[in-house]
């Protein structure tokens, strides 16, 4: 004989051979086996969900319970030897139905899938004696977990109290009320299946059923019931079925046949509403009705059973609904963790990449993020729903909400990061695209519509942002609405567009200002150049008429106004393509007028520098002094009124100094209306629009200068200095003219030619008679003429002077060397040195261009 205690005890590895005879759920010492889940996994029950059934068998010790289960379900529970009577099953054992899938005559009559059978230790054994604690606890455990309770009873024990296990059944009824007392909303039902052993048929089965049901009714009436259940019936909580089996030893063939027939009753069935157990009508169909199932998923059974037994063995009030909730809490947490592991594998790489991009300050739009988010979320929710939806609905829904919250929190952060990356990269790409299009238009030289470029790029940027957003969002979630982010993106695009437009208008203004500067430089320069011409003809306009000098500033102002008006037209026409507002155009024109005035004033200051002004005054004076009214150069003669012409020309030129010293219009004898022309500061101008503008007197009140002070070109001291210097220059011109006139009066006396002819007659004849002399004279004359025509006499004279000076220096040097080579010379040199005079030595390389010794000033000039 072998006992169940020898097989698969607690702690054995999950090798399938170790569980050949089943697994011990609870040992004789009331210890729960933690390897139940391993056994269920090996038997492929863990993933069955609700598609499993649990049966427990009750009965007195040594009544053949294990034998019955082995024949019904093909299990290998240990059985008692026929040669002795003793306890075989210790504790509670469990095994899976081994006859699952066996062929039957009727294919519709087949055993249910995944039937788990629990063999409970027999009652009324001498090993435990009067200790009924384990008996009660095991009954409570079996009732809390099993759908069907098989009561193994012999026919001759029917009608007895102890022999028919009436005490055990009373315990079952009592613990049943205790078990489901706290869950009054649901009536949990179980099936009590009486298997009457050694049934010979002398007493009809119906009579045995009637006797047992009368005993059940008396037992139910005898137990104390909680308030509200006093009138309850045993049929409110239990269903009953009965089956008789022949004697195993005396009728072995009939026993085997009947057990096989009985095994087919362990299939799924439906309640027949036409049958009433109170009238003795009992079903003979499938025993597994839906209402019997405890609704504990197979993967959570081990945990649930352990929790139930812990409550039972510690004598705590067993609250099955609470246990189911605790199991649901535990299993849902486990499932949630498993689901999150798979979720992390899909999402963490994107989170790390996004985090790294954020740390580097280079936001990146992650490809494939949306598909990964949708797929991982759907898988997580689906897997959780598949595994956890079988548990307590309240716990499942709460944990599902927790899962969705965790998943959505992380996915929302990814979506936000993706939208931020699309936002920043889109803004950068938009700015670069607009700048590139503008540069391309400028290079092509053709006109380009800035507003059209901006509008086109804005459409592209928004479309790209929406594509990224749509590809990333997870449908059906409240956090996938990106309208706010899109609105912020559109707002920043508008801000950037405005900034780019202002920058482009600023560049346009700069180009227009350079154009104004160029035009004013030419036009105003011509007006100042005209001051240098004091005559008509070549120095006047093409008409030959000399412009009036007193209207000089009128012409400058008119040229300035016309140039700026032309620039304003250019600016306005170009700004219209920028879609600029009227306020922006007004600010641009206002800045253009102020900048243009600065350009004009800078040009005037450049022309009015002391050197330039003296040059123009001298040119003006010389034109009036050296040329007549027709523009013909004067040839001075002693009879000319040089003093009168000089005085008139000088006084006429001197009138220019007070004219040029102040910007004043001849028509009004007042400064030009600069303040009205520039206008007031536009209300839309910002401090940034004004910060680079220099103040203008008479326009800016805070400048503290009046318009007259702004129009002051030359101060009084400058005017006096210019007057003095000009007069000195004019006096030089006058002296030169006077010398020219007097020089024309100096002539050689006629008698000198007669004297020259008389004294040099012989030499003249000698030269004329001698061809060589004559030819030499001719060559010299031609050379002198050519030299004169080429203006080379001056350089020749300078070279001659330089050569003679160098020869003198070289002669002194050689003389010194000669003296130093003799004793007498050295003594003379020593005496000369003692007298305090040191001889000057000059090298050829130290001579200046004029043949003189080079000074430090000459060296500085050569460096420049």
UniProtKB/Swiss-Prot annotation:
SUPFAM superfamilies: P-loop containing nucleoside triphosphate hydrolases (SSF52540). The keyword Transferase does not apply. Residues 480-506 form a coiled coil. GO terms for cellular component: endoplasmic reticulum; endoplasmic reticulum membrane. GTP binds at residues 59-66. Residues 1-747, 793-864 are cytoplasmic. The chain crosses the membrane at residues 748-768, 772-792. It is a multi-pass membrane protein. Residues 688-701 have a biased composition (Acidic residues). Residues 769-771 are lumenal. GO terms for biological process: endoplasmic reticulum membrane fusion. GO terms for molecular function: GTP binding; GTPase activity. Cooperates with the reticulon proteins and tubule-shaping DP1 family proteins to generate and maintain the structure of the tubular endoplasmic reticulum network. Has GTPase activity, which is required for its function in ER organization. Belongs to the TRAFAC class dynamin-like GTPase superfamily. GB1/RHD3 GTPase family. RHD3 subfamily. This is Protein sey1. It comes from Aspergillus fumigatus (strain ATCC MYA-4609 / CBS 101355 / FGSC A1100 / Af293). The gene is sey1.
């Amino acid at each position: 004989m072998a006992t169940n205690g020898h097989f698969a005890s607690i702690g054995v590895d999950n090798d399938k051979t170790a569980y050949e005879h089943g697994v011990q759920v609870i040992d004789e010492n009331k210890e729960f086996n933690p390897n139940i889940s391993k056994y269920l996994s090996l038997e492929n029950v863990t993933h069955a969900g609700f598609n499993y059934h649990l049966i427990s068998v009750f009965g007195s010790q040594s009544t053949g319970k294990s034998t019955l289960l082995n024949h019904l379900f093909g299990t290998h529970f240990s059985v008692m030897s026929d040669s002795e009577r003793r306890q075989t099953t210790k504790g509670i054992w469990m095994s899976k139905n081994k006859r699952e899938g066996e062929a039957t005559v009727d294919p519709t009559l087949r055993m249910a899938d995944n039937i788990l059978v629990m063999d409970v230790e027999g009652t009324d054994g001498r090993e435990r004696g009067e200790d009924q604690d384990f008996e009660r606890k095991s009954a409570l455990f079996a009732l809390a977990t099993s759908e069907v309770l098989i009561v193994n009873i012999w026919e001759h024990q029917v009608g007895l109290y102890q022999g028919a296990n009436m005490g055990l059944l009373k315990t079952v009824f009592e613990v049943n009320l205790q078990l489901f007392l706290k869950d009054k909303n649901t009536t949990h039902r179980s099936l009590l299946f009486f298997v009457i052993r050694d049934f010979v048929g002398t007493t009809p089965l119906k009579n045995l059923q009637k006797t047992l049901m009368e005993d059940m009714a008396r037992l139910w009436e005898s137990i104390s019931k909680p308030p509200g259940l006093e009138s309850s019936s045993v049929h409110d909580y239990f269903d009953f079925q009965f089956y008789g089996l022949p004697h195993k030893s005396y009728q072995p063939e009939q026993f085997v046949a009947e057990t096989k027939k009985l095994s087919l009753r362990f299939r799924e069935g439906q309640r027949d509403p036409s049958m009433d157990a109170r009238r003795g009508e009992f079903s003979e169909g499938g025993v597994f009705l839906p209402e019997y199932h405890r609704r504990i998923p197979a993967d959570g059974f081990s945990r649930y059973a352990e929790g139930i037994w812990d409550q039972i063995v510690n004598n705590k009030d067993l609250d099955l609904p609470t246990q189911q909730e605790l199991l649901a809490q535990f299993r849902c947490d486990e499932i949630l963790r498993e689901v999150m592991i798979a979720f992390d594998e899909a999402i963490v790489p994107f989170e790390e990449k996004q985090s790294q991009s954020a740390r580097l300050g280079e936001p990146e739009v992650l490809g494939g993020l949306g598909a990964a988010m949708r797929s991982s979320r759907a898988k997580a929710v689906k897997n959780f729903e598949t595994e956890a939806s079988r548990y307590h609905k309240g716990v499942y829904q709460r944990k599902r909400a927790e899962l969705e919250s965790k998943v959505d929190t992380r996915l929302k952060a990814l979506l936000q990061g993706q939208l931020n990356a699309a936002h920043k990269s889109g803004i950068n790409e938009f700015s670069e695209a607009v700048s590139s299009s503008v540069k391309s238009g400028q290079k092509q030289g053709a006109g380009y519509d800035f507003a059209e470029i901006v509008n086109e790029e804005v459409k592209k940027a928004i479309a790209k942002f929406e594509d990224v957003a749509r590809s990333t969002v997870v449908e059906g979630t409240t956090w996938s609405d990106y309208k706010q982010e899109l609105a912020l993106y559109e707002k920043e695009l508008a801000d950037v567009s405005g900034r780019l437009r202002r920058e482009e208008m600023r560049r346009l203004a700069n180009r227009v200002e350079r154009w104004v500067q160029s035009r004013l430089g030419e036009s105003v320069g011509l007006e100042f150049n005209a001051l240098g011409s004091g005559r008509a003809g070549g120095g006047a306009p093409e008409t030959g008429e000399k412009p009036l000098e007193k209207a000089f500033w009128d012409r400058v102002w008119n040229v300035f106004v016309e140039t700026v008006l032309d620039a304003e037209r250019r600016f306005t026409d170009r700004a219209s393509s920028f879609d600029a507002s009227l306020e922006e155009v007004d600010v641009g024109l206002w800045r253009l007028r102020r900048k243009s005035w600065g350009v004009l004033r800078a040009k005037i200051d450049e022309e009015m520098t002391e050197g330039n002004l003296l040059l123009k005054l001298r040119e003006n004076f010389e034109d009036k002094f050296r040329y007549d009214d027709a523009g013909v150069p004067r040839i001075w003669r002693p009879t000319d009124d040089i003093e009168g012409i000089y005085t008139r020309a000088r006084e006429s030129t001197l009138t220019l100094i007070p004219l040029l010293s102040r910007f004043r219009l001849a028509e009004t004898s007042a400064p030009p209306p600069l303040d009205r022309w520039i206008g007031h500061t536009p209300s839309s101008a910002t401090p940034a629009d004004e910060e680079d503008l220099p103040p203008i007197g008479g326009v800016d009140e805070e400048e503290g200068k009046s318009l007259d002070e702004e129009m002051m070109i030359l101060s009084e001291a400058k005017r006096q200095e210019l007057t003095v210097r000009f007069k000195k220059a004019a006096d030089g011109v006058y002296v030169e003219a006077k010398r020219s006139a007097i020089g024309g009066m100096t002539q050689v006396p006629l008698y000198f030619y007669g004297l020259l002819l008389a004294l040099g007659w012989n030499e003249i004849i000698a030269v004329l008679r001698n061809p060589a002399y004559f030819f030499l004279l001719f060559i010299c004359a031609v050379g002198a003429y050519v030299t004169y025509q080429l203006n080379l006499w001056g350089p020749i004279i300078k070279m001659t002077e330089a050569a003679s000076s160098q020869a003198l220096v070289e002669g002194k040097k050689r003389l010194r060397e000669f003296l130093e080579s003799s004793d007498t010379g050295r003594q003379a040199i020593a005496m000369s040195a003692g007298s305090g005079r040191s001889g000057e030595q000059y090298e050829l390389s130290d001579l200046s261009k004029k043949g003189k010794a080079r000074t430090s000033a000459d060296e500085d000039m050569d460096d420049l």
